[in-house]
């Protein structure tokens, strides 16, 4: 037998293994075993690893994008876009050395005492008028708080003696005011002189003016009941529609209520502005429409009432519109988000319309004059100078569109005084008047444009030979005239009142007759949105012809606006009679029994005008205001020598000579 094999040698070990249980028993069961992540990863197939890497990369990308979105939201919530913050820092005034009894302050006191003797307050009784930076606890602006902090001890030292100042019926104690002393002078006393200049206590309303007041109250009843604080009333469905969400109708009607002497209604509207009008909203607004309606409405109401609340709101809103001017060409974008400061062109084009970019100058210039912030005026005047220097015009006539990137006219060869170009011509004249007739470039452009209209756009209809303004497209004339063009006779008459050639008045009279006939020849007595004129003798045709798509009426003001100017300049009472006829037609065919007035679809059907269920803000902001002024026996009520109306009928003062 063989001996049993020897056991194998023990394995060589050159280390010692030590196990520390730390009071726990060692467990080597499967439930306790763990493999390293790397070993697990290596055991996965290539496909599995690629899928996991893709998912991780996707999640990281989503997290990065979310962080950017969150940062933008915080930026919006901060209250100012970066561009606006930069602008505010640049214009923050330096605190002057305190002077208790300077000659300038004594002069302001003299002005106050003199104006109190002559001024009769009109408006809501017992209005508590606050300084610009103390509108309400919730509504105090950021720049007001900064100015408050900047005052510090200087204001406390200056207000050791309590002095009571009576200002337009309100009692203001200096230690309660938060603005700088020189700012009080600029924002309160100086504009108060202007307010007393453009507004004088009128005579009691006559019968026709009472008719306008009744119409306004009926419109306002519908707005109060069904659309209070919203943009526009839908009177038939008894609800509202929103455009900007900023109480557009209410702001547009503020100065109308003041002019009509509706104290209680004005007081209620002012309360809404003080407590509810907040511009820190993530909403896009159209630069042109919001400027002429909101900024213009606030500025004019400030001048009429002397209430600094409206100037504070106007300054805040103006700053929020400024990012629209940050384009390569300085031609502003059409839209701007007033909460984030993001400005842009419409989605379908990079163009702005010429009327939009050249019909905001009156408002921004006046805002600069009141606040001392030059950027407002500089931005809009740069646009005016740029348009002046451009080629592509035809004897003073301008195309309808301009590119915000290149700063050049687009769609050349098309000329109209209707939509997209109309108020360019209006604001040439009105800026010249506003500035005290010193800016000759504006006057030259206006006069040249009127000559261009005569040469290229004027024709006469058949059979009554009505003079009308048509359109020109690449050398081809179209006998089409928007109701918007009916602003022109009034603008021509205004120019004659301020010394322009007398033949402008002849054209104004002729065009006024045409605009009246655009109303008179319709079965409802109301003008269509667009009219076409018959240029050839036909026994069975009227002068004014209307296509089915153009026969609606939006309660527009242009005809009664021009009637107001023609009556002021000529004092011919037929213009008052024509306006009264139009008011009666509004009452008969557009009035909604429950409150409000509605635009209509068919001015040619007196039996079924078909309400469109919308009352535009300009009906109470412009149409009824111009009718009230037209019927006034007092030609000094908002005199054409002391104020100029913006294109939304908001009166602004003519600047006194320096």
UniProtKB/Swiss-Prot annotation:
Its EC number is 3.2.1.113. GO terms for molecular function: calcium ion binding; mannosyl-oligosaccharide 1,2-alpha-mannosidase activity. The chain crosses the membrane at residues 51-71. Signal peptide: none annotated. Residues 1-50 are cytoplasmic. Its main location: endoplasmic reticulum. Disulfide bonds join 486-515. Keywords: Calcium, Disulfide bond, Endoplasmic reticulum, Glycosidase, Hydrolase, Membrane, Metal-binding, Phosphoprotein, Signal-anchor, Transmembrane, Transmembrane helix. Pathway: Protein modification; protein glycosylation. The keyword Calcium applies. SUPFAM superfamilies: Seven-hairpin glycosidases. One of its GO terms (biological process) is protein glycosylation. This is Endoplasmic reticulum mannosyl-oligosaccharide 1,2-alpha-mannosidase. It comes from Mus musculus. The lineage of its organism: Eukaryota, Metazoa, Chordata, Craniata, Vertebrata.
């Amino acid at each position: 037998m063989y001996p049993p094999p020897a056991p194998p040698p023990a394995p060589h070990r050159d280390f010692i293994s030590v196990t520390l249980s730390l009071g726990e028993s060692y467990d080597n069961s499967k439930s306790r075993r763990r493999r390293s992540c790397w070993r697990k990863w290596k055991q996965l197939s290539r496909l599995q690893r690629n899928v996991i890497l893709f998912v991780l990369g996707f999640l990281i990308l989503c997290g990065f994008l979310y962080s950017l979105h969150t940062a933008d939201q915080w930026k919006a919530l901060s209250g100012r876009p970066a561009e606006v913050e930069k602008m505010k820092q640049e214009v923050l005034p330096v605190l002057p050395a305190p002077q208790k009894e300077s000659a300038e302050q004594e002069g302001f006191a003299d002005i106050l005492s003199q104006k109190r003797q002559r001024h009769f307050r009109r408006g809501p009784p017992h209005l508590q008028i606050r300084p610009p930076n103390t509108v309400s606890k919730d509504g105090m602006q950021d720049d007001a708080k900064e100015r408050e902090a900047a005052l510090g001890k200087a204001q406390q030292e200056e207000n050791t003696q309590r002095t009571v100042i009576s200002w337009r019926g309100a009692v203001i104690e200096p230690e309660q005011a938060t603005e700088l002393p020189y700012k009080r002078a600029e924002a309160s006393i100086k504009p108060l002189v202007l307010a007393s200049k453009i507004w004088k206590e009128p005579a009691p309303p006559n019968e026709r003016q009472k008719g306008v007041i009744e119409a306004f109250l009926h419109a306002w009843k519908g707005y109060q009941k069904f659309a209070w604080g919203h943009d526009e009333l839908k009177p038939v469905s008894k609800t509202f529609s929103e455009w900007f969400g900023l109480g557009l109708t209410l702001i547009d009607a503020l100065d109308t209520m003041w002019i009509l002497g509706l104290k209680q209604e004005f007081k209620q509207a002012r309360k809404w502005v003080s407590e509810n009008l907040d511009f820190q909203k993530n909403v896009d607004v159209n630069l042109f429409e919001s400027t002429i309606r909101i900024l213009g409405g606030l500025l004019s109401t400030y001048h009429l009432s002397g209430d600094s609340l409206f100037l504070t709101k106007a300054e805040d809103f103006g700053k929020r519109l400024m990012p629209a001017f940050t384009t390569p060409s300085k031609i502003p974008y059409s839209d701007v988000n007033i909460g984030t400061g993001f400005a842009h062109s419409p989605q379908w084009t990079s163009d702005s319309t010429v009327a939009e970019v050249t019909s905001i100058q009156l408002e921004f210039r006046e805002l600069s004059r009141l606040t001392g912030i030059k950027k407002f005026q500089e931005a809009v005047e740069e646009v005016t100078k740029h348009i002046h220097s451009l080629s592509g015009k035809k004897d003073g006539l301008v195309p309808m569109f301009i590119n915000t990137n290149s700063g050049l006219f687009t769609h050349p060869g098309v000329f109209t005084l209707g939509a997209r170009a109309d108020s360019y011509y209006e604001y040439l004249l009105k800026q010249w008047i506003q500035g005290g007739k010193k800016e000759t470039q504006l006057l030259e452009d206006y006069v040249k444009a009127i000559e261009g209209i005569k040469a290229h756009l004027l024709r006469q209809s058949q059979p009554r030979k009505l003079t009308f303004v048509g359109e020109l497209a690449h050398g081809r004339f179209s006998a089409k005239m928007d109701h918007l063009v009916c602003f022109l006779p009034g603008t021509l008459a205004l120019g004659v009142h301020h010394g322009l050639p007398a033949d402008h008045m002849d054209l104004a009279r002729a065009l006024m007759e045409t605009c009246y006939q655009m109303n008179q020849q319709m079965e409802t007595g109301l003008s269509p949105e667009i009219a076409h004129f018959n240029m050839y003798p036909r026994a069975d045709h009227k002068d004014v012809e209307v296509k089915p798509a153009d026969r609606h009426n939006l309660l527009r003001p242009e005809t009664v606006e021009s009637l107001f100017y023609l009556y002021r300049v000529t004092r011919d009472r037929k213009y008052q009679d024509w306006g009264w006829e139009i008011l009666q037609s509004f009452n008969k065919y557009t009035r909604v029994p429950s409150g409000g007035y509605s635009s209509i679809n068919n001015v040619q059907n007196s039996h079924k005008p078909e309400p469109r269920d919308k009352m535009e803000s300009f009906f109470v902001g412009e149409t009824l205001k111009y009718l009230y002024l037209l019927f006034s026996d007092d030609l000094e009520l908002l005199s054409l020598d002391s104020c100029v109306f913006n294109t939304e009928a908001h009166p602004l003062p003519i600047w006194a000579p320096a």
